[in-house]
Amino acid sequence: MATTKALHLTRCTLYVAPPQQLANNRHTHGSRFRGRHVDRLRLLDESVKDNEHIIKLTDNAQKKIKQLAAETEGESLILKLSVKNGGCKGLQYKLNPIRKDEIEADDYVQQFEELKFILSIDATSVIYIYSNILDYSYDLINGGFKFINPNATKKCGCGKSFNV
């Protein structure tokens, strides 16, 4: 596997609730987060406080991001990462370009100045993204960004769908 570089996530400056309230925030996370999910939220809170790794980028992902950022004509490339219901295993990754004003107040945000890249992770999706590796495949069939998720109990062969 290609070498990885860490992606450290920080809270968007507009976020008003402290990270330790994440596990108790029923409005954001709903009642479906119990047991191991709450444990994962606690680990995430500790990681954000200690500025530890949330997600990693492989060399291939970094190369593709640099290429996409070069096409933005001086602006930083901003991608929104979220997890939605769907796909063949129940949950599906969504990675879409957005404008800076579309970053939501409770998103986890990371800037990669050397890549001219900003990653905005939806607050309700962060629990599923924790410890993932973002890779890029140049394969003709099923090429594109792929997620390697060590938390997934079921995975789709395409790398875009999973379950926990």
From Swiss-Prot:
Entry binding sites for [4Fe-4S] cluster? C88, C156, C158
Predominantly, its location class is plastid
Q: Where is this protein found? A: Plastid, Apicoplast
List cellular component terms (GO): apicoplast; chloroplast stroma
What the entry lists under PROSITE patterns is as follows: HESB
Q: Which InterPro entries match?
A: FeS_biogenesis (IPR000361), FeS_cluster_insertion (IPR016092), FeS_cluster_insertion_CS (IPR017870), HesB-like_dom_sf (IPR035903), ISCA_plant_cyanobact (IPR031108)
| The keyword Metal-binding appears for this protein | yes
What GO biological process term is on the record, naming one? Answer: iron-sulfur cluster assembly
A GO molecular function assigned to this protein is: protein-macromolecule adaptor activity
**Pathway(s) the chain acts in:** Cofactor biosynthesis; iron-sulfur cluster biosynthesis
Alphabetical keyword list: 4Fe-4S, Apicoplast, Iron, Iron-sulfur, Metal-binding, Plastid
In terms of SUPFAM superfamilies, this protein maps to:
HesB-like domain
Quaternary assembly: Homodimer.
Function statement: Participates in the sulfur mobilization (SUF) pathway for iron-sulfur (Fe-S) cluster biogenesis. Involved in the pre-assembly of [4Fe-4S] clusters and their transfer to target proteins.
Cross-referenced NCBIfam families: iron-sulfur cluster assembly accessory protein (TIGR00049)
The record's similarity note reads: Belongs to the HesB/IscA family.
PANTHER family per record: IRON-SULFUR ASSEMBLY PROTEIN ISCA, CHLOROPLASTIC
Protein's name according to its UniProt entry: Iron-sulfur cluster assembly protein SufA
The organism encoding this protein is Plasmodium vivax
Instruction: Tell me the lineage of the source organism.
Output: Eukaryota, Sar, Alveolata, Apicomplexa, Aconoidasida
